[in-house]
Curated annotation (Swiss-Prot):
GO terms for cellular component: cytosol; ribonucleoprotein complex; ribosome. It comes from Thermococcus sibiricus (strain DSM 12597 / MM 739). InterPro entries: Ribosomal_eS17, Ribosomal_eS17_CS, Ribosomal_eS17_sf. It holds the Pfam family Ribosomal_S17e. Keywords: Ribonucleoprotein, Ribosomal protein. This is Small ribosomal subunit protein eS17. GO terms for molecular function: structural constituent of ribosome. Belongs to the eukaryotic ribosomal protein eS17 family. One of its GO terms (biological process) is translation. PANTHER family: 40S RIBOSOMAL PROTEIN S17 (PTHR10732:SF0). SUPFAM superfamilies: Rps17e-like.
């Protein structure tokens, strides 16, 4: 079983994904840079977790599992 992500990470990732749907791709490194540009988060760990969750959301959308 995997770990459950914190609410802050999920909420921030969803907000970014909803506001800027065309900015993100399935590439984690690209998403990491975009999260850094679009937010004021200074923690590298938080940035990476948010970028990872955004990458997951992009993949799920492409597979048609989320609207």
């Amino acid at each position: 079983m995997g770990n459950i992500k914190q609410g802050f990470i999920k909420r921030t990732a969803r907000e970014l994904f909803d506001r800027y749907p065309n900015e993100f791709t399935r590439d984690f490194e690209h998403n990491k840079k975009k999260v850094e540009e679009l937010t004021n988060i200074t923690s590298k760990t938080m940035r990476n977790r948010i970028a990872g969750y955004v990458t997951r959301l992009v993949r799920l959308k492409e597979e048609g599992k989320i609207l």
